[in-house]
Amino acid sequence: MTHALLIGNPNCGKTTLFNALTNANQRVGNWPGVTVEKKTGEFLLGEHLIEITDLPGVYSLVANAEGISQDEQIAAQSVIDLEYDCIINVIDACHLERHLYLTSQLFELGKPVVVALNMMDIAEHRGISIDTEKLESLLGCSVIPIQAHKNIGIPALQQSLLHCSQKIKPLKLSLSVAAQQILNDLENQLISKGYKNSFAYYFSRRLAEGDTLIGEKAFTESLLIKLQETEQNLDVLLADARYQKIHEIVTLVQKKHSDASEHFTAKLDKLVLHRFLALPIFFAMMYLMFLFAINIGGAFQDFFDISTETIFVQGSGWLLQQLHAPHWVIALVANGVGKGINTTITFIPVIAAMFFFLSLLETSGYMARAAFVVDKAMRAMGLPGKSFVPMIVGFGCNVPAIMAARTLDSERDRLLTVMMSPFMSCSARLAIYAVFVAAFFPSGGHNVVFSLYLIGILMAVFTGYILRKTTLKGHASPLILELPAYHRPSLRRLLRETSMRLRFFVYRAGKLIIPICVILGGLNAITWGGGISSGEANTDSLLSIMGQWITPLFAPMGIHQDNWPATVGLLTGMLAKEVVVGTLNSLYAQVGHVGEIAAAHFDFWGGIKAAFGSIPANLSELGSALWNPVSASAADSELSQSVYGIMSRRFDGAVGAYAYLLFVLLYIPCVSTMAVIRQEANKRFMWTSIVWSFVVAYATSVVFYQGAKFLDHPQQSMVWILAMSLSLLFVLAVFRYSQYGMGRQNAAANT
């Protein structure tokens, strides 16, 4: 078996190459002692097994104790500690000179190296030609030109791994005699300490470059003290010598012609990164994403809703009635399992549209610029601009967003990002928004969704600002970001990425929603006295009584006693936000007897015909929804016969619905998110996040509802608004003056 390490700069196509080499034969775990994801894969070449370990993307192998992320530390340590046969160094052909810096450090390990020169097609399109044979001769290792995203060059790269036993000699750097003598002395001291010659050579260079995490701590510190006494800036001298040698190589092997794409990128960046226009353009792109998701995706939502309700809810209910099944069985199967399947599948068009647009922004090159644009605004408040990149991931799911914070350099920035990310509206919340938009905001629903996303971002920024002023004081680290050239992503790649994200979401949502719907159906069928209720919903069921007990707590935000299913939805939503819509669908269907009505008037072919007919009908109204949302068509006249109709009667109009959505937006996303906060920070930060999210969710929802209804009951509204304001101030005071501040020294303790 051959074991190869895959390493390269960020955004060099390393993960794409890893997927191309290993296909589905991958395993995901964590590196020992840390929460950084470890990806390994394997493939067979004839009868020879080759295992690949994908290391985090890094620019350098120097692991400084200060300002190093967990990803960088893992990569730097892995090339020393792991047992492997060769290294695959992935290089972006468009940025050859920059990426060869890491290559020069890898050569100093003395291990076999294969250079995978990726993105050759893009380099050619930009007028860059590289003599790979000459580059191979100058480097002294195999150089394989590839196009990982098209699987071009992959077989040649695989074959090269069978013949990579030749050890690589380090590049000859032009150093002064004094500097070379210091390096030789370091090397000799390391050899006398018991290090092998090859590792002594590598360690001496890392120490000279300021690596404080390599080798034994006491011995390393003594060598570093001696280095400081030499009054030689070896780190600067080595870096300068590397760049000089790399420049010589690149001059010999690379020719660059006029690059139309660079001119286009420069011209477009003058607009996109404009001092005054950058932020409006950013908000316009976010607005377009919600416009696309709600209107384009929503045009197909009725098809999935009507067809799955016809098959799984009405169809199963009708079939069980023909078999004379008990009412509680019909409730469990039709309004439990059936409604769960219906709810899960109805998510697909809106979520898929959002994932597609996010992939478009990422692959086109705009997302990196979005982080750059937001950085200035966030740094003005002392917040890390780099944290915006993980927070954007939160639009898909808060869990990977929080885990992505580990790539940040400082502990303070990482913890700030962990605490800010839960307020980003994930795709599960978008599913809830879509349901309420259909029921309460038939005109301009995307404006409602955009406002919720914007409020979430503002609350995340506010949370970060409060923490910066209280428990996480300090200065934001500078943003160092590579801005890729703009390019047109292939439709195939966009669809593949959308499909991968969508499959994960539907699987995760379905396995939670369906069991929850079955449990809720059972609780709604069992009475307080232990009996089984009839097919008609009643207020004596266990679920009804539980909901009615808690509902008065939410009365100030417009949830009245008869709307107890909304309260149950909030409770189940703490497990996962995907469950909220399933809970509401299941309970409102049973409370409103939708199941019995549907089963009694079941028309299979009529339902399927209506499902297909909804697509052209919705698409025909798309123009007015896009260009003039205010005058878009009103809700379907038959809405009152559906779950949407029941919801619209139970909530206090659009005001009550929006207050409910504010609470859904701001309170804890799910138990998975809280568990990841516990893992990435500590238990105290987790409980702080839970308490803070509930306080701001309740206060914001109550203040909005009471403010909107102020003219109806001014005295009552004023009391609630003042009470919520004082409660929020009290919590802020606790953060500010608490004797148990969550200093950085406690953040690393996972207790």
Curated annotation (Swiss-Prot):
Localization annotation: Cell inner membrane
Lineage: superkingdom: Bacteria
Residues at which GTP 2 binds: 33-37
UniProtKB keywords: Cell inner membrane, Cell membrane, GTP-binding, Ion transport, Iron, Iron transport, Membrane, Nucleotide-binding, Transmembrane, Transmembrane helix, Transport
Sites where the protein binds GTP 3: 54-57
Pfam families, sorted: FeoB_C, FeoB_N, Gate
Residues engaged in binding GTP: 118-121, 147-149
Domain annotation FeoB-type G: ranges: 1-167
Membrane topology: Multi-pass membrane protein
Cellular component annotations (GO), alphabetically ordered: plasma membrane
Protein name: Fe(2+) transporter FeoB
Organism of this sequence: Legionella pneumophila subsp. pneumophila (strain Philadelphia 1 / ATCC 33152 / DSM 7513)
Gene name of the encoded protein: feoB
